[in-house]
C-alpha cells in the first residue's frame, strides 16, 4: 500500500487522532494528540515513540511552543505544558468547556487557545500564565495564527480576525463564504489570507485585505467528492496544511484522500493514494520536505467497524508541491 516515499509510524494512538504537528525547526519530531487521552512525541526518522503524557479526557489539539515544550488541551478543559526533555508537566490553566484549538504565535510570543466556552485565551509561555480572555460570538471550532493576527472560525459560520498585539476589539467580522459548517481554517504563510474548509466538500480561498480589488481574488471550489453508483458522495474536508515555502496547501477529507492545491493558478497539483479511513489531520514539516497524514475514523457513520487509526509519514517533492507556472 505504501511506497518507498512513505511509511507508517509504529505505536500509533489507541483511539482517534485529533492533531499532528511537527517541531518548529526540524522534521525529526512529531507531536500527536488523541482521543485516547494521550499526547505522544515521535522520533520520525527512527520510527519510534519517544514520550507519552496523559490528560484526563480526550486531547483535541497540541502545539509546540519551542522544540522542548509541548502544549495541549481537550475535553478535560485543562491546558497543559509539558517539558519534553525532563518529562515534567505544568497545568497552566483551564477553560470552562473543552479546549478545541492550541496554537503558538512566535511574532507576539503567546500561546493561543480556543474553546467551546466561546472564548479565546492568550497565555504567556514564559511564566506560564493567562494573558487575557476574549469573548467570541459562538463556540470556537478552529483558529490559525497569521503573523501577529489571529483568524478564528466559530459555530454559525462566523470568522473573526483579531490583532494579537491589541485584542481590545475585533479587526474584522466575516461570515464564511461556504454555506455549511466550518471545519478548518489555516493561514497562508505569506500572511495575505487564509483557506477555510467545510463539512460539505468545499474549500474557500480568502484574503485579509478588505479592499474591493483584493476581495475580487477570493474564490471557492468543490473537492473531496466521489461518484459511487452514479451518486455523488460529499465528504467533510477536515484538515488543511500549508507548504511554508511554496504557499501551496494540502487538504484531507473523510473520503480518505489527500490533495495538494496551487491556490494561485487554481489547480490541483496531485492526489495521493486513498488512505484506509478519514484524514483527520495533516502537517507539513517547516522545510516542506515531509507531510504527516493522520488516517483516523471520525465517526461520520456512527460506531461501525473501521480500519485502525494510523499516522503516515510521506516524503514530498517539489513536483508535488510547487506551483507549475509563474504566478501572475
Swiss-Prot record:
<dbReference type="GO" id="GO:1990298">
    <property type="term" value="C:bub1-bub3 complex"/>
</dbReference>
<keyword id="KW-0137">Centromere</keyword>
<feature type="repeat" description="WD 4">
    <location>
        <begin position="129"/>
        <end position="164"/>
    </location>
</feature>
<feature type="cross-link" description="Glycyl lysine isopeptide (Lys-Gly) (interchain with G-Cter in ubiquitin)">
    <location>
        <position position="216"/>
    </location>
</feature>
<keyword id="KW-0131">Cell cycle</keyword>
<keyword id="KW-0469">Meiosis</keyword>
<dbReference type="GO" id="GO:0051321">
    <property type="term" value="P:meiotic cell cycle"/>
</dbReference>
<feature type="repeat" description="WD 7">
    <location>
        <begin position="267"/>
        <end position="316"/>
    </location>
</feature>
<feature type="modified residue" description="Phosphoserine">
    <location>
        <position position="211"/>
    </location>
</feature>
<comment type="subunit">
    <text>Interacts with BUB1 and BUBR1. The BUB1/BUB3 complex interacts with MAD1L1. Interacts with ZNF207/BuGZ; leading to promote stability and kinetochore loading of BUB3.</text>
</comment>
<dbReference type="Pfam" id="PF00400">
    <property type="entry name" value="WD40"/>
</dbReference>
<keyword id="KW-0995">Kinetochore</keyword>
<comment type="similarity">
    <text>Belongs to the WD repeat BUB3 family.</text>
</comment>
<feature type="repeat" description="WD 1">
    <location>
        <begin position="4"/>
        <end position="44"/>
    </location>
</feature>
<dbReference type="InterPro" id="IPR015943">
    <property type="entry name" value="WD40/YVTN_repeat-like_dom_sf"/>
</dbReference>
<dbReference type="InterPro" id="IPR036322">
    <property type="entry name" value="WD40_repeat_dom_sf"/>
</dbReference>
<protein>
    <recommendedName>
        <fullName>Mitotic checkpoint protein BUB3</fullName>
    </recommendedName>
</protein>
<keyword id="KW-0007">Acetylation</keyword>
<dbReference type="InterPro" id="IPR020472">
    <property type="entry name" value="G-protein_beta_WD-40_rep"/>
</dbReference>
<feature type="modified residue" description="N6-acetyllysine">
    <location>
        <position position="179"/>
    </location>
</feature>
<keyword id="KW-0159">Chromosome partition</keyword>
<dbReference type="GO" id="GO:0005654">
    <property type="term" value="C:nucleoplasm"/>
</dbReference>
<dbReference type="GO" id="GO:0034501">
    <property type="term" value="P:protein localization to kinetochore"/>
</dbReference>
<keyword id="KW-0677">Repeat</keyword>
<dbReference type="GO" id="GO:0051301">
    <property type="term" value="P:cell division"/>
</dbReference>
<dbReference type="GO" id="GO:0007094">
    <property type="term" value="P:mitotic spindle assembly checkpoint signaling"/>
</dbReference>
<keyword id="KW-0597">Phosphoprotein</keyword>
<feature type="repeat" description="WD 3">
    <location>
        <begin position="87"/>
        <end position="125"/>
    </location>
</feature>
<keyword id="KW-0132">Cell division</keyword>
<dbReference type="GO" id="GO:0000776">
    <property type="term" value="C:kinetochore"/>
</dbReference>
<keyword id="KW-0013">ADP-ribosylation</keyword>
<feature type="repeat" description="WD 6">
    <location>
        <begin position="217"/>
        <end position="263"/>
    </location>
</feature>
<keyword id="KW-0853">WD repeat</keyword>
<feature type="repeat" description="WD 5">
    <location>
        <begin position="170"/>
        <end position="210"/>
    </location>
</feature>
<dbReference type="GO" id="GO:0043130">
    <property type="term" value="F:ubiquitin binding"/>
</dbReference>
<dbReference type="GO" id="GO:0008608">
    <property type="term" value="P:attachment of spindle microtubules to kinetochore"/>
</dbReference>
<dbReference type="GO" id="GO:0033597">
    <property type="term" value="C:mitotic checkpoint complex"/>
</dbReference>
<keyword id="KW-0158">Chromosome</keyword>
<keyword id="KW-0832">Ubl conjugation</keyword>
<keyword id="KW-1017">Isopeptide bond</keyword>
<dbReference type="GO" id="GO:0005829">
    <property type="term" value="C:cytosol"/>
</dbReference>
<dbReference type="InterPro" id="IPR001680">
    <property type="entry name" value="WD40_rpt"/>
</dbReference>
Amino acid at each position: 500500500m505504501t511506497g518507498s516515499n512513505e511509511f507508517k509510524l509504529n505505536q500509533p494512538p489507541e483511539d482517534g487522532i485529533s492533531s499532528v504537528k511537527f517541531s518548529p525547526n526540524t522534521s525529526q519530531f512529531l507531536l500527536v494528540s488523541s482521543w485516547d487521552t494521550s499526547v505522544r512525541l515521535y522520533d520520525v526518522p527512527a520510527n519510534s515513540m519517544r514520550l507519552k503524557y496523559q490528560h484526563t479526557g480526550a486531547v483535541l489539539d497540541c502545539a509546540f511552543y519551542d522544540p522542548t515544550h509541548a502544549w495541549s488541551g481537550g475535553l478535560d478543559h485543562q491546558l497543559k505544558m509539558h517539558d519534553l526533555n525532563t518529562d515534567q508537566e505544568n497545568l497552566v490553566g483551564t477553560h470552562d468547556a473543552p479546549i478545541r484549538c492550541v496554537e503558538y504565535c512566535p511574532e507576539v510570543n503567546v500561546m493561543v487557545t480556543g474553546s467551546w466556552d466561546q472564548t479565546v485565551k492568550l497565555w504567556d509561555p514564559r511564566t506560564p500564565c493567562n494573558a487575557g480572555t476574549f469573548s467570541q460570538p459562538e463556540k470556537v471550532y478552529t483558529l490559525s495564527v497569521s503573523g501577529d493576527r489571529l483568524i478564528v472560525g466559530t459555530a454559525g459560520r462566523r470568522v473573526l480576525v483579531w490583532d494579537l498585539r491589541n485584542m481590545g476589539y475585533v479587526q474584522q467580522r466575516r461570515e464564511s463564504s461556504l454555506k455549511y459548517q466550518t471545519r478548518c481554517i489555516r493561514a497562508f504563510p505569506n500572511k495575505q489570507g487564509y483557506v477555510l474548509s467545510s463539512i460539505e466538500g468545499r474549500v474557500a480561498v480568502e484574503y485579509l485585505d478588505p479592499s474591493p480589488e483584493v476581495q475580487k481574488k477570493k474564490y471557492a471550489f468543490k473537492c473531496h467528492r466521489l461518484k459511487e453508483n452514479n451518486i455523488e458522495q460529499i465528504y467533510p474536508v477536515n484538515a488543511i496544511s500549508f507548504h511554508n515555502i511554496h504557499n501551496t496547501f494540502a487538504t484531507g477529507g473523510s473520503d480518505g484522500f489527500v490533495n495538494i492545491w496551487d491556490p494561485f493558478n487554481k489547480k490541483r497539483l496531485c492526489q495521493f493514494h486513498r488512505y484506509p479511513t478519514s484524514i483527520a489531520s495533516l502537517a507539513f514539516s517547516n522545510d516542506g520536505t515531509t507531510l504527516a497524514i493522520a488516517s483516523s475514523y471520525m465517526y461520520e457513520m456512527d460506531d461501525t467497524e473501521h480500519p485502525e487509526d494510523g499516522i503516515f509519514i510521506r516524503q514530498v517533492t517539489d513536483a508535488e508541491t510547487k506551483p507549475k507556472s509563474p504566478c501572475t
